[in-house]
Amino acid sequence: MYYMLIGFIIVVIAIISAGYILKRKHYQRINELEETKIKLRERPVIDELSKVKKLKLTGQTEALFESWRSSWDEIETRLFPDLEEVLLEAEMNTDRYKFRSATYVENDIEQMLVVIEKQMDQILGGLKELLISEEKNAKESRMTKEKFAELRREVLTRGFKLGDTLPYVETKLDELAENLNRYDLLTDQGDHLEAREIVLIVQKEMKVIEAQMERIPSLLHETDTILPEEMNKLRAGYEEMVRKGYYLAQMELDKEITRMKTQIDKMKRNVINLDLDEAEQGIEELHNEIDLFYDTLEHEAEARHFVKENHSPTSDKLQRQNTVSDALAEQITEVKQTYHVAEDDLAVYLKTSAKLSEAKENFEQLTALIASGEIAYSAAQDTLKEIDAALISIGAEQDKFAEELRSLRKDELEARDDAERMRRAIVTLDRKMERERLPGLPEEYLSLREHMGESIDALEKRLEEKPLNMKAVTQDWRIAEEDLNHLTEKAEEMMENVRLVEHVIQYANRYRLRNKELADELVQAENHFYNDYQYKKALEIAVTALEKVETGAFKKVEKAYESKVSVDDIE
């Protein structure tokens, strides 16, 4: 019982302590919120409103001031009283140990303080800006009016440099003067915000006018002096070159100068209307056009030098190529008596001959135009270059064709010599096979041998035709070469098989008396070897039989054969 009482007392003390701690914590937060409220109340909103109210306000400024005052009245008459009530509610909840309710209320108080602070910031910021604006307007107004007076003086002293743009500039200045008068009126009426907008507009416009006054004299100098002088110099240079014999009608300079004068008039109107960017762009484009005309004249002078330097050499080159072409025609006539010349090959010559005639005709026309002065030197230069390129191409094609004609005789002699060589090669191959003392020759080889002879006969017969068709000769020649190579390969293979069969049977004889199956298969191999001369088949049968008795024996025999070691020495 005693211990229960002690435990109860401890629990009560713990509850009271916890309540005290929580209560103290909530009062601490409430006090902090109260301090924030006091700081907000101490902000000088009323003082700032009083300062601004002393100013003479109208228009936008007055409307803004009224909105700020209305916002402050709301804070003073509604938001602060509401805040007091909620603070009292938080204290009551804390006293009654309604800590959860107290927490909710404290959070609401924080939000209310944020709203009040935000509204007060807006009011004070606007009032401050208005006071500064009034002071700044006065300062900037003085500076703006001084700058405007300077512009007026500059127009009076340097107006002659503005030419026909002077009335337009003066009109702009008159508009600015009206805006400055309006600024004074708005300031007197107390509409300081709208007055500030006017000051900013005037400052911006003055910068534009100042920049325009800097650019106008140079642009007028371009349209009134520089460009006309440039065109006069261009015309003088053009006329001098015409007197020297240049054909320049393609430039249509009179028409172009008339057009450029119209462009200058348009650019001058742009300057007068203060469309300076468009005028500047047009002036730059016109300078570029004049430069292009000068480039054309310079190109004509360079082209004249080129024509004078290259006309005679091109004429000589044309004559030389005509001589080559005539010689080639004679060569074709001679060759056709002995050799057949394909129509395709003749077409190549005829095509180059036609190109040569065209080049000659173009050169003659060009020479006549140069003599009469009816062609621009640039066009004459282009034509000369085209003729020269054509002559280079024609020369290469005709040289190639001439070489092909010369090679016909060379190819004929080589084909005749090779036919003799192939006959000698067959005789040599026959003798080599005789020395091998073969039991006989298989039908397949005899057929190849006969076909080889026919191929050489066909080649020799083709070489006796008149006129000689070298394309057909070349085809028969290639066939004969292929047949000889094939025959030689078969002969070498056959002799190789014969030697290997002899070595394999000789090695297998050591097992012959002891192995009847081997003996029978060796007899079969020997029948193919001696009777029908199927040496490859005989080798296959003998090798298969030997491998049954001794695996790997053929490799030993083959190695001994390659090393020229006697079969009897193989272990």
UniProtKB/Swiss-Prot annotation:
GO biological process, one term: division septum assembly
Positions on the Extracellular side per record topology: 1-3
Functional description taken from the UniProt entry: Negative regulator of FtsZ ring formation; modulates the frequency and position of FtsZ ring formation. Inhibits FtsZ ring formation at polar sites. Interacts either with FtsZ or with one of its binding partners to promote depolymerization.
One annotated Gene Ontology cellular component of this protein: septin ring
Family assignment from sequence similarity: Belongs to the EzrA family.
Topology Cytoplasmic: residue spans: 23-571
Name of this protein: Septation ring formation regulator EzrA
Location of this chain's protein in the cell: Cell membrane
Transmembrane segments: 4-22
Primary location: membrane
Keywords: Cell cycle, Cell division, Cell membrane, Coiled coil, Membrane, Septation, Transmembrane, Transmembrane helix
Membrane topology: Single-pass membrane protein
Natural source organism: Listeria welshimeri serovar 6b (strain ATCC 35897 / DSM 20650 / CCUG 15529 / CIP 8149 / NCTC 11857 / SLCC 5334 / V8)
Cell membrane found in the keyword field: yes
